């Protein structure tokens, strides 16, 4: 019976988080109130407190849930590719696919969080989002560095600059795709990615 209750509790927690991530991707994380989430998830505010304890913990759990989805949709396909340039190309392709399929209804969750929390230093949510963005940059740089070491890119390739260019392409595609709903921006991003990589091929 205790195990059944824990299972029910875990299912409720997962369902609440699914709703919370969806709402946060559209409406923002900091503005998501417990009352709004309780209404949308069909639970009481006291029930939410039983699962999260505080607004800060709710925010951190939402970020973790979104992180898990992002890793599954974008990072894992890249890690499964051959090392070096194939991984760099795959992670860009996976990101654009994840945008195109609207895995999060409000577009890339983390791009939205960057815009929301970039100037709100000192909060746990800001620190978590900043850490994720740094980790994302370092991952792409590691793929590009291996590609350079293996001769897939020029030895003169400026890895941080290349990654900056690729990140700019995919993140701008995300913003424009959400704002205008025009799938052509994804093709423009693919062209920008191909051009940036081609300029660094040996």
Residue ranges and their predicted role:
Residues 1-27, 31-40, 57-60:
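Basic, helix-initiating cap at the start of DNA-binding domains
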Residues 106, 111, 155-176, 191-196:
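Hydrophobic alpha-helical segments that form the core
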Residues 24-27, 33-34, 45, 55, ...:
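Amphipathic alpha-helical segments enriched in hydrophobic/aromatic and basic residues
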Residues 71, 105, 122-149, 161-164:
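Amphipathic alpha-helical packing segments from all-alpha helical-bundle domains
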Residues 41-52:
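Short hydrophobic/aromatic patch on the recognition helix
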Residues 87, 101-124:
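Amphipathic alpha-helical segments used for helix-helix packing
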Residues 61, 75-106, 159-166:
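Hydrophobic alpha-helical connector segments
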Residues 1-3, 90-98, 134-150, 169-172, ...:
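C-terminal peripheral helix-coil segments that are non-catalytic and often amphipathic
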């Amino acid at each position: 019976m205790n195990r059944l209750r824990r299972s029910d509790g875990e299912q409720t927690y997962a369902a609440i988080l699914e709703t919370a991530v969806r709402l946060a991707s559209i409406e923002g994380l900091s503005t998501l109130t417990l009352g709004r989430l309780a209404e949308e998830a069909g639970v009481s505010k006291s029930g939410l407190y039983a699962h999260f304890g505080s607004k800060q913990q709710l925010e951190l759990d939402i970020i973790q849930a979104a992180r898990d989805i992002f890793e599954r949709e974008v990072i894992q396909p890249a890690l499964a590719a051959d090392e070096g340039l194939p991984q760099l190309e795959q992670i860009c392709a996976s990101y654009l696919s994840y945008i195109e399929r609207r895995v999060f209804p409000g577009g890339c969750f983390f791009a939205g969080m960057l815009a929301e929390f970039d100037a709100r230093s000192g909060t746990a949510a800001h620190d978590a989002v900043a850490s994720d963005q740094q980790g994302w940059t370092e991952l792409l740089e590691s793929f590009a560095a291996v590609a350079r070491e293996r001769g897939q890119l020029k030895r003169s390739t400026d890895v941080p600059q290349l990654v900056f260019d690729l990140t700019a392409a995919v993140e701008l595609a995300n913003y424009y795709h959400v704002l205008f709903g025009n799938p052509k921006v994804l093709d423009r991003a693919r062209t920008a990615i191909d051009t940036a990589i081609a300029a660094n091929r040996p």
